[in-house]
From Swiss-Prot:
Purpose of the protein: Transcriptional activator that binds specifically to the DNA sequence 5'-[AG]CCGAC-3'. Binding to the C-repeat/DRE element mediates high salinity- and abscisic acid-inducible transcription.
Species classification: Eukaryota, Viridiplantae, Streptophyta, Embryophyta, Tracheophyta
Induction (UniProt): By high-salt stress and abscisic acid (ABA) treatment.
Name of the protein: Dehydration-responsive element-binding protein 2C
Underlying gene: DREB2C
Biased composition (Basic residues): 45-59
Amino acid sequence: MPSEIVDRKRKSRGTRDVAEILRQWREYNEQIEAESCIDGGGPKSIRKPPPKGSRKGCMKGKGGPENGICDYRGVRQRRWGKWVAEIREPDGGARLWLGTFSSSYEAALAYDEAAKAIYGQSARLNLPEITNRSSSTAATATVSGSVTAFSDESEVCAREDTNASSGFGQVKLEDCSDEYVLLDSSQCIKEELKGKEEVREEHNLAVGFGIGQDSKRETLDAWLMGNGNEQEPLEFGVDETFDINELLGILNDNNVSGQETMQYQVDRHPNFSYQTQFPNSNLLGSLNPMEIAQPGVDYGCPYVQPSDMENYGIDLDHRRFNDLDIQDLDFGGDKDVHGST
């Protein structure tokens, strides 16, 4: 009996692409939510949430070693340790294969993304906090990207409108022809700034040559005498005023007397007789040597003038003091000059 070869058909998972199916469900749910918001109410539930079902993944004793402790919805472990995620379409639809993953956590995230796309806000999620956070981040990035694109387009449009309206000016050529030259607004701004810089340089040169001193002097006179703005002129009393000529004369007298004193000290010659009598006087440093009075020198002391003594009736006989010895003087003690008793 010839053996019959039975061809087993490999189980087909469908000809449709899973990513395309999820995209169609996501667009459908977004359209339903937008229509419910336009009607005046808040976002309404699109359909009934999926049944809770079993969270064990597969029958007891089947699958991998950690399959019995897995609590994620739509996730199960194979015998060789890999994790898979599956989800079923609403109303008893086909089962969608989401892929094979190395951990149950990654498989749970894949199931949550598919559930959000198919069931919308009524989806039952394994990790709602993480899934909602990632969805809000993606939505924010999408909105910011659209806003950036819109701002770029508006900037381009505004720039084109500016160039068309007032950015360029037409200047006729000097050869009296009908040709015109377009000037950019930036060139006009540069020319205006250049003119302002030239005016500023001319002003600085005028101030440097003293042209602006008259205006400053007129301003000071107007401030002192009153500039007509209901301001009374400044008044100073007699005690507060002074004569400038008198002040200059006092300063000149002081300078002349100081110069004469300094000149006398500079022109004075050192006394060499004092240096011969006191050779150690150079050790004093900056001290000037004392001069010994000469017989013919008059220092202007009135109490030593002989003429004044004669006028006052004082007769000074120098001969009485010629034979006088120092020992004959009595200073009120028994000691002599040398300290002996």
